[in-house]
Amino acid sequence: TIINVKCTSPKQCVPACKAAMGTVRAKCINGKCKCYI
């Protein structure tokens, strides 16, 4: 699931994905965070 959080590295997405979806599996794709459940 892509969330509306800008990123330059996957590490920036981990807290955002954890807060949004309760998962720490995250990637940064095209400058946006993508969370995996």
Curated annotation (Swiss-Prot):
The keyword Secreted applies. It is found in: Secreted. SUPFAM superfamilies: Scorpion toxin-like. GO terms for molecular function: ion channel inhibitor activity; potassium channel regulator activity; toxin activity. Keywords: Disulfide bond, Ion channel impairing toxin, Neurotoxin, Potassium channel impairing toxin, Secreted, Toxin, Voltage-gated potassium channel impairing toxin. Disulfide bonds join 7-28, 13-33, 17-35. The record marks 36 as: Aromatic residue of the functional dyad. The keyword Ion transport does not apply. The record marks 27 as: Basic residue of the functional dyad. Pfam families: Toxin_2. Expressed by the venom gland. Coiled coil: none annotated. GO terms for cellular component: extracellular region. Negative results: does not block hKv1.4/KCNA4, hERG1/KCNH2 and EAG/KCNH1 currents, at 1 uM. Reversibly blocks hKv1.1/KCNA1 (50% inhibition of current at 1 uM). Seems not to be voltage-dependent. Belongs to the short scorpion toxin superfamily. Potassium channel inhibitor family. Alpha-KTx 02 subfamily. Has the structural arrangement of an alpha-helix connected to a beta-sheet by disulfide bonds (CSalpha/beta). This is Potassium channel toxin alpha-KTx 2.14. It comes from Heteroctenus garridoi (Cuban scorpion).
